[in-house]
Amino acid sequence: MTWNQALSDFNLYLKIERGLSQNTIASYSFDIDKLISYLDTNNITSSPIHITHLTIQQFIYQISKGMNPRSQSRIISGLRSFFSYLVFEDYRPDNPIDLIESPRIGRKLPDTLSLIDIDRIINAIDLTKEYNQVRIGERDRTMLETLYGCGLRVSELVNLKISDLFFDEGFINVTGKGDKQRFVPISSTTQKYINIYIRDVRSAIDVQKEYNDTLFLNNRGKQLTRAMIFTIIKKLAAEINLNKTISPHTFRHSFATHLLENGADLRAIQMMLGHESITTTEIYVHLDKKQLKKAIQTYHPRK
């Protein structure tokens, strides 16, 4: 079995059997491609069936120079999944990654924005800005209001459809990881901006046929990419001299943190974020020590 054949079969397994998104599959492939390139560069002819843990360990050592433990751990995890698949399919008897120790990593707390910073970023958008007669400033404001107002992942934002909007009921239908769907409440404020965008901006775009139902479009009538959203946010952060590195995911983290600070139930936040496990959502508890202290002072019988 060649590396390309093994990788192709693995990607198909991830898509069909595990129902993973294309972005997640691409992340797995990226790390395995690095291993393949390493073997080619060093004239190592080991196949995926016969490669040893020593060769893989040398590869990890080579690419890990200057890499933080979390990134190293992610690569090892991806390779472990790949070789576990080969073992599962009886292509090889063992998983060589089992003999490689992952670096110890702490649980990184996500960066968040204050409400003031979020307002500063959104207010920095030039609402008069046009490109090919498309008011992209209005569009950008609506996207950021939706990111923060609904706690969406960037992939969920760019894939949002007009048919996913159920404003009369106060919800939107979000397609998350693994094509799993969930209903997320949407505030009247976010609804207002989306309605303005659809009425005044999207209606003026010459929409490509395959994107008739896609909510957020570029000036050519096509779906926005995740990279474009990252670029928009980076530019706005630079304009206001924000002293932290942010991404679209920062708005999602801020959404969850602000809900928790204002008394929302952790399981409700879990459902809105689309986390399968409550332990993933529990990371936000660690962000708000004041809230935890207040809970003890307010509710514990021994004040």
Where are the regions that the model predicts?
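Conserved catalytic core of the tyrosine transesterase superfamily
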Residues: M1-K303
